[in-house]
Design a protein with these regions (language model features):
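Residues at or immediately flanking beta-strands
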Residues: 23, 103-105
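ATP-dependent carboxylate/phosphate-activation module, predominantly the ATP-grasp catalytic core
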Residues: 28-97, 101, 108, 120-147, ...
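Conserved protein kinase catalytic/activation segment
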Residues: 112-115
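A general structural signal for well-ordered secondary-structure junctions
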Residues: 21, 98, 152-153
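Amphipathic, soluble alpha/beta structural segments
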Residues: 11, 15, 108, 169-177
């Protein structure tokens, strides 16, 4: 992570030395709170399944922080769910997704709203198990219903609340030399 143009200049040669290209690409690092947002699209409209905090730690100075825990539900779920659903509905419309999963990773800064960094028509790996632990919604059954019983899938999604009664978290362990 470069915090200034002076940092970029100081690290340019060592960074360029690790590349086969004669240029570097850089992107702005968003240091806002990061979220995993699982939605389910029903008739073109996004419904929030879950919003989880992606908690991160930088293990060394100048390193991009790495995720160490995904905690369900985020304390900001009630505050962010309408904006998240609106964004996911726009994404679904853009790609033509009418029914099924759509997951979004996004950053949030107070006063700036959500900034999407990734969206995919899938569920978040093992995290569907945390949704089941926290809310009781079986994502596996929802996926099966999505294929074999669309009315049942729709009913499951419309009856679901992302404001879980139980907290659940997935931990990530990192090894460093």
């Amino acid at each position: 992570v470069a915090n200034s143009i002076d940092d970029v200049r100081a690290r340019f040669r060592s960074t360029a030395g690790q590349s086969t290209f004669d240029y570097l690409m850089a992107e702005e690092y968003n240091d806002g709170q990061e979220f995993n947002i699982m939605t389910w699209i029903v008739d073109g409209q996004a419904h929030i399944i879950s919003i989880a905090d992606r908690e991160k730690i930088a293990f060394e100075d100048g390193e991009i922080p790495q995720v160490v825990r995904c905690a369900y539900p985020s304390p900001l779920t009630a505050e962010l769910q309408d904006e998240a659903a609106s964004i996911a509905t726009k994404i679904a419309g853009y790609v033509g997704l009418e029914n099924g999963p759509l997951c979004v990773q996004a950053f949030y800064r107070e006063g700036e709203g959500l900034a999407v960094c990734e969206a995919a028509g899938r569920i978040f790996g093992y995290e569907h198990e945390l949704v089941t632990l926290g809310s009781g919604l079986s994502v596996e059954e929802l996926l099966i219903d999505c294929v074999y019983d669309q009315p049942a899938a729709k009913a499951r999604v419309l009856a679901h609340s992302p404001l879980f009664a139980t907290h659940a978290a997935g931990l990530y362990f990192h090894g460093h030399d």
